Amino acid sequence: MELSVLLFLALLTGLLLLLVQRHPNTHDRLPPGPRPLPLLGNLLQMDRRGLLKSFLRFREKYGDVFTVHLGPRPVVMLCGVEAIREALVDKAEAFSGRGKIAMVDPFFRGYGVIFANGNRWKVLRRFSVTTMRDFGMGKRSVEERIQEEAQCLIEELRKSKGALMDPTFLFQSITANIICSIVFGKRFHYQDQEFLKMLNLFYQTFSLISSVFGQLFELFSGFLKYFPGAHRQVYKNLQEINAYIGHSVEKHRETLDPSAPKDLIDTYLLHMEKEKSNAHSEFSHQNLNLNTLSLFFAGTETTSTTLRYGFLLMLKYPHVAERVYREIEQVIGPHRPPELHDRAKMPYTEAVIYEIQRFSDLLPMGVPHIVTQHTSFRGYIIPKDTEVFLILSTALHDPHYFEKPDAFNPDHFLDANGALKKTEAFIPFSLGKRICLGEGIARAELFLFFTTILQNFSMASPVAPEDIDLTPQECGVGKIPPTYQIRFLPR
């Protein structure tokens, strides 16, 4: 090796050592954690299997509250339902800020209900919750919308005549159509090419965010953003979806009837008109598009992915599917469509759906938060704007609440008498002020779609149950189930 190269390496090593020695600890009162290197943070201590595995390993050493440096920035990690509840419920206001997901932040930039903060978030959340409730309780309730969509699904599955299929885009279609009926005022045919294109962009984006590159980008986005990578594809995908939404908004402008708004976009446009003289109004074009995109994305990917996990688990554990079917026969019968009030009489089915959500662990690290003020927490001081990760997976896999946390077992949610048993550690929708605003719709979709399919079809796989692999294909921000083939066989 040339002398000049050796001298350069020696100089670089010396500089790094000097930085480590002189690196001022500006976060002396943050929770403890592995010692970071300048710029690199805790990169060298990370588990190559991903961020979640790294955080779980750090928890073993530092407990339920600790600090990890993702690149140069400190992030406080909260594990276990007690710490998560203490933050999100007992100190709800302080922990109500929204952090950033590096792969999508350049696109959203704090707009839309999911990534907004401060007054903008309060205005958009209040509007979204109220409008979704109003359109879900009018002439056609959310339950009726889901029941109608479920019947469309049954017709589509019958057309398959028991052929092998990948259910990904069909499950996306049914969940997307529910949110589309509320936001856009219409549903789409399952073969609509523009609709399928949007769903493919959502699927690809969620997968890329959850990929190994997505996790690496979370650490070093300030550097990696200047180079080619999956982040650019994510930005392009979101631009394309946003363009479609913008086109839909213009169509709504042309047909808007102020006396009879037909969906969420119409209602938003009326708010814009009402507040057009207010220079500080949050009812802007940008918030309209990105709020719509946020609801469209969240209302599609999360529930459809849970359904995909659910039917993969039914293939893996056919005795569970058979027991659910027996309960459907007993309570509903073979002909009447399932209704939400049936849930109270179907504890086993409800337990299975809860266990699917718990086991699939769809957002294992939650969605990042920030503290809105200097906050005292368990003897530590968390400075304002510090990021906080709520590791929901540690609640959903807590052995104190779930006897066999790594196994799929509906008995986790049943008491000794077979009645439904709820537990405070079951928090797939998170907690507090940022709890998923679509929780009610998602729970209704899961029950009605799941039971309607099992009422009408049995399932078969080309793979023996014992050979079905449940290992996720990606596990980052989201947990993506493996692709699989399934037959839906009419009963």
Swiss-Prot record:
It holds the Pfam family p450. The keyword Heme applies. Disulfide bonds: none annotated. Its cofactor is heme. Gene3D superfamilies: Cytochrome P450 (1.10.630.10). GO terms for molecular function: anandamide 11,12 epoxidase activity; anandamide 14,15 epoxidase activity; anandamide 8,9 epoxidase activity; arachidonate epoxygenase activity; estrogen 2-hydroxylase activity; heme binding; iron ion binding; monooxygenase activity. Its EC number is 1.14.13.-. It is an enzyme of class 1 (oxidoreductase). This is Cytochrome P450 2B6. The gene is CYP2B6.
